Amino acid sequence: MASGKSLPAFSPERFAPTPQRPLRAKSRVLEHLADIQPHRHDWAQLVFSISGAVRVNTTASTYIVPPSRAVWIPPGIVHAVTAIEQCDLRTLYFGPALLAGEAWQVGRVLEVSPLLRELVLALPALPDPAPPESAADAERRCGIERLVLIELQRARPLALGVALPQDARLRRLCEAMLQEPGRHAGLDEWAQEAGASPRTLSRLFREQLGTSFAQWRSQLLLAHALTLAARGRPMSLIASELGYASASAFTAMVTRTVGMPPSRFFERA
């Protein structure tokens, strides 16, 4: 994948949660392949694209997310964002008292309900210093914020994160596979480019990612397939773009990996 324009993190401190406004919203349009540089902050974040798919990278995982999903990033986690296509990005920042339970201390992908999508769009995306609010506007905003929290607590978590290793050799291999999801090379072929033997890489997959090469690749393909499904691509075209000779072979992979056929798995993409 060609590299795009690298962008700063767009002054997140100007949207920092406060006791008066513990939930903040930010809006930004990213061009195709634009990168938001790695950064971190002291508050939790929800990354959600209104249109277009994004890839969110942390040191431990990568998430490929279409508009019907969002990525939860706990406080203090270094992360970067890449626009897989032009996207209208929304970011929510959460004060420490919001969603502070144990389940919210790990990054994950969440399903976005139609109601949550509309609530995010309704939140004012104003940086500091924000203009004064009328009592009616403040009451409306607080009501929307309460509903956002309720919908997030109801949101279904999805196992769509793709774990990334610390070992430099395995990291090179994983990053290369992320760039070429439709390339159906075996571990022997990928090993030649990674600078390690297939046996070493197989061991590293188990030790660092707790999975096999084949299982990790299936998870990667699912993440890419979900993005294609969100664009309305037919199953046969998704299978072809991901390097499968037939839709039935792709269906078998999805069913084997998630326990259901793609028609069910992607029905809300």
Where is each model-derived feature located?
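Alpha-helical residues within the helix-turn-helix
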Residues: 192, 203, 207, 240-241, ...
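Short hydrophobic/aromatic patch on the recognition helix
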Residues: 68, 201, 205, 249-250, ...
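Short, Lys/Arg-enriched, Trp-marked, Pro/Gly-tolerant hinge/linker segments that flank
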Residues: 106, 130-194, 207-219
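Terminal helix-turn-helix DNA-binding modules in bacterial transcription factors
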Residues: 188, 207-251, 267-269
